Amino acid sequence: MLFRSSEATGELIIACDTSGSMGGIYPTVFGEIARIAENVNPDGVRVIWWDSSVCGEQLFKPHEFNTIGSLLKPSGGGGTSPQCVVEYIRSKKYQPKGVVWLTDGYLDGSDGKVDVPALWGVVDNDHFVAPQGKTVRIYSN
């Protein structure tokens, strides 16, 4: 895990791929978002929905973590360019303690390198190599 639950974590960004290939695995992804929020217990979880651009974001506070799965509203459905998230985080001047990427790993070639610790949760793709940080394999079955 990116953080131990006893650490003061500040805000955590979860960057969720919403490209067309992700739709069928949203239940798995939503479960991972809920587990991350509840287990890490950061000061806030900012979910950024992205495909070839950032399509939306949602900010959740600790009192919402136990129902976060039902509150998630993904938007997008186009290509897959993680660099748009990096640029978005910089333009908004967000200072997260870490970024968790949730994706199937079929990216456009841009790297998605952030200036904070990164964890890549990759669904149903054993061949993906993260551009930075650690990779966790997630299986939808």
Enumerate the language-model features and the residues they cover.
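Von Willebrand factor
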Residues: S6-E64, L72, C84-T103, L107, ...
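Glycine-centered flexibility sites
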Residues: G20, G78-G79, G105, G133
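Short, small-residue-biased leader/transition segments that mark boundaries at the very start
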Residues: M1-L2
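Short, surface-exposed, polar/charged, turn-prone segments marking secondary-structure boundaries
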Residues: N41-G44, P74-G78, H127-A130
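Acidic, Ser/Thr-rich peripheral helices and adjacent loops at domain boundaries
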Residues: Q58-P82, V136-N141
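VWA/integrin I-like adhesion module and closely mimicked acidic/polar interface patches used
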Residues: Y106-N141
